[in-house]
From Swiss-Prot:
The keyword DNA-binding is annotated on this UniProt entry: no
Catalytic activity field: 2-(N(omega)-L-arginino)succinate = fumarate + L-arginine
Matching SUPFAM superfamilies: L-aspartase-like (SSF48557)
Protein name: Argininosuccinate lyase
Amino acid sequence: MADHGASNPGSLDKHGTNEGALWGGRFSGGPSEAMFALSVSTHFDWVLAPYDVLASKAHAKVLNKAGLLSDADLETMLGGLDQLGRDVADGSFVPASSDEDVHGAMERGLIDRVGPEVGGRLRAGRSRNDQVAAMFRMWIRDAIRDIAVQVTQLIDALSEQAKAHPDAIMPGKTHSQAAQPILLAHSLLAHAQPLLRDIQRLQDLDKRLAVSPYGSGALAGSSLKLDPEAIAEELGFDSAADNSLDGTSSRDFASETAFVLAQIAVDMSRLAEEIIYWCTPEYGYVTLSDSWSTGSSIMPQKKNPDVPELVRGKTGRLIGNLSGLMATLKGLPLAYNRDLQEDKEPIVDSVAQLNLLLPAMTGLVSTLTFHENRMRELAPAGFTLATDLAEWMVRQGVPFREAHEASGSCVRIAESRGVDLIDLTDEELASVDSRLTPEVREVLTIDGAVASRSTRGGTAGVRVAEQRERVEKLSGELRGWAETPVRG
C-alpha cells in the first residue's frame, strides 16, 4: 500500500486540473480540492495494483486479437506492463498526489514507460467499472486462500492440544452452569468444527467469485468485438459474466466475503471467551504462555489474556464492516454507482484484521498449559452426574419421566447434606425410589459418565479420537485447496 501522504489532497500542486484522472474531455477544469479529497481512493485501492497489471496484460492480448493493437505495440505494451509490475512490487512506483485511483495511477505509470501512443491504446473497450469489479474479485480470491491456510493452522493447533490430552476430563456446561463431564479434547475439537465450515464457506464463495465481469464495459458491454471469455481464462476465472449490468454493479460477492470473514472472527471469539475464563484463578484450567500474554502497569501479579480479548474486541469490527457494506448496497439502482467505491475498505480491513488475529490465536492455543487435575476436580461439581443416575434407572426399565424426578430428588438431598451423589447412603437412595439400588454407584463416576457417551459425536474417548482423525483429514484437504494458486 502506498504512503498515504503521497495522496494527501492538501499537497496538491495541480489544483484545478484533471491530471491523474481517466476522464475530463467534456469538463473545462478539474475538480475542486474538496471534491478530489472525497474522490481519491489510492490510499486503499492500491492493493489492487498487481492485479491491474495482470488484467491489463490480458486486455492487451484481446485488443491484439481483435485487430486493435499491432503485434509490435502488443510486445511494447507487455514489456512496459512487466516493468511496471516490478516497480510496483519493489515500491519504486507509487501513486502521485494527483492520482485519483489505482487505475489512473497505473495508466500513468504505463504511459511513462511506453509513451502515450502505445500506452493510450490500452483503455479501449474497458471501463473502470468492469475493471475494478474484476480486479477486486481477483484480490479477494487470493486473500481468502491466505486466510483459509491460517484457519487450518488454528485448527491444527486445536487438534494437537486434543491429541496431547486424550483423557483429560473437564466440566461441560450449558447456560454457563455445570451440565455433564466431557473430555477436554471433545471441547477443543468442538471449536475446530465451525472453523472447518468457515473454510468450506470460503471454498463455496470462491465459485461465485470466479465469474469475470471483464468485458462488461461501463454497463452495456463492448462494441469492439473483444473476447471476455479469453480474458476470464487467462485471469483464472471459470467463466465470464452472463449479464454486463450485473457484472459491473453487483457486489453481493463482497458482502458474502464480509460475512464469511466476520463468521471466522465470531467463531474465534467464542473460543477466546472460553480461554479468558479458563485462565482465571476461579477456573484454573489453563496457564497462558508468557509469549502470548501481558502484564499490568500497576499490579505486578497480573497476567492478562490480551490475545483472546483482542480477538473478542476486533470481532465487533468485522461485524461492523459487514453491516456497513450491506447498508451501502441496500438502495443502489442499476448499474454502477460511485457508492461502490465503499466496497473495498471494509473487505481489505477485515482481511487485515484476520491476518493479525489468526496467527496470534494459533500461537496462543498451541502454547496453552492445561491443568488436568484442576479440571477433573471440578468435573463432578454441580451434580453433573445426575443425568447418569437417571439414565441408569431408564436402563432398569424405569420411565424417564420418573427417573428424572428421582434423580432431581437425589440432588436435593445431596445438596442439603453438602455431599456428592455418590456419597448418598443406601437408605437415602431407597427413600427416593426403591429401584435405586447400590449398583447405581457404578455410573456415578466421571470416567464412567464420559465413557458411556459413545454414540457418534459423543464425548467417549474412542469417539473423540475418531473425531480428531476426521478433523485432521478434512483440514488437510481444505488446505490443499487453499494452497492451490488461482492462476498457474
